[in-house]
Amino acid sequence: MFLDALEFFCCYYIKSVYSFFVNYVPDKWVVVKIEGKNVPLTYKVFGCWYGGYLGSNSWKLNSGIRKVSKGEDSWLFEGFSGSIYKGFNSNYGMHMYGSGVLNDIINKSEEVGVKVEIMPEHTNWLDLSYE
């Protein structure tokens, strides 16, 4: 009985602390690769959120991925700013609004010699170099 209570407490505590440090959990997300003549190779999380009935859809591009860790059904991306994005495996992709915004970013970046590319869904994010 005591061990069951201790195990419950430890699991609950760890999940609470873990959740405390995650800043963003997008409804949809992709990783983009950015590089150019004067732009060092950088990977960033592009997150999309549904607005719901009275809200509006939104998006956010993180500061650049510094570190990645793998969860059971998700990935954690730590940005250069210190923020942490949690991307669930089943949510890789974008909603229509986010897709339009990112395509606009890709097109405008090309005009100034910067290549922005959406990474494939099944990329092993642990295999990439981030620094």
Residue positions per predicted region:
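Cysteine-centric segments in proteins
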Residues: 2-76, 83-131
